[in-house]
A protein has these predicted regions:
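Short linear motifs at protein or domain termini
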Residues: 1-47, 53
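Conserved amphipathic alpha-helical segments that form helical-bundle/coiled-coil interaction surfaces
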Residues: 40-122, 136-144, 152-163
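Short helix-capping and inter-helix turn/linker motifs at the boundaries of alpha-helical repeat units
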Residues: 65, 129-132
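Structural signature of alpha-solenoid helical repeat scaffolds
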Residues: 81, 126-129
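Short arginine-rich
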Residues: 162-171
Length: 171
């Protein structure tokens, strides 16, 4: 399950990744308890908003550079109107914000939820208008994070999450 690290010839150790102590049981619980889409989305919303808030205080150059790179990928995919590239970059965008939050538990939980939700989405984006909306929402969030406006980034992320539920027909 990732909570114990077995090293042949050396012994058995408790994993150094403390985030696994939360994430692995969460993954199994969600998997075993069937369809909990609404509950998962509520937790995702809370984590995404908090991650955006914390990301505004990010001082990790590597994480900030990744966020920049992903924002550039989103821009390129938008210009090309390449839906697949855009959706892949969308997942990376949210992941990089979680990384910028500096909270490994938030990051790990959002990765787990993202993997679960990838299989739950009933429709994806269906038109260029939605692509533009998401692009503009991401640009706003990214700009507020760069401006070190945690409150603004959190509000923009909250609005983005609300709109995403409608776009992806989550119920």
């Amino acid at each position: 399950l990732g909570m114990i690290d077995i090293r042949p010839g050396q012994g058995t150790y408790i994993s150094g990744n403390e985030a696994n102590f939360f994430v692995i049981p969460l993954s199994w619980s969600l998997f075993m308890n069937g369809n909990q889409t609404e509950s998962i989305l509520e937790v995702r919303d809370l984590l995404e908003v908090k991650a955006a808030y914390l990301a505004a205080d990010c001082v990790d150059d590597r994480a900030l550079n990744r966020l920049y790179d992903v924002s550039h990928k989103i821009h390129q995919a938008y210009v090309e109107q390449n839906y697949k590239k855009f959706l892949d970059a969308d997942l990376e965008f949210h992941s990089s914000i979680a990384e910028c939050s500096g909270n490994t538990v938030i990051y790990s939980m959002l990765q787990t939820i993202s993997n679960l939700m990838r299989h739950v989405s009933e429709t994806g984006m269906i038109d260029g208008r939605q692509l533009q909306e998401i692009y503009e929402e991401h640009q706003k969030i990214y700009g507020l994070i760069l401006a070190k406006d945690g409150e603004g980034a959190a509000e923009a992320m909250e609005e983005h999450m609300k709109r995403s539920k409608v776009r992806y027909n989550y119920r």
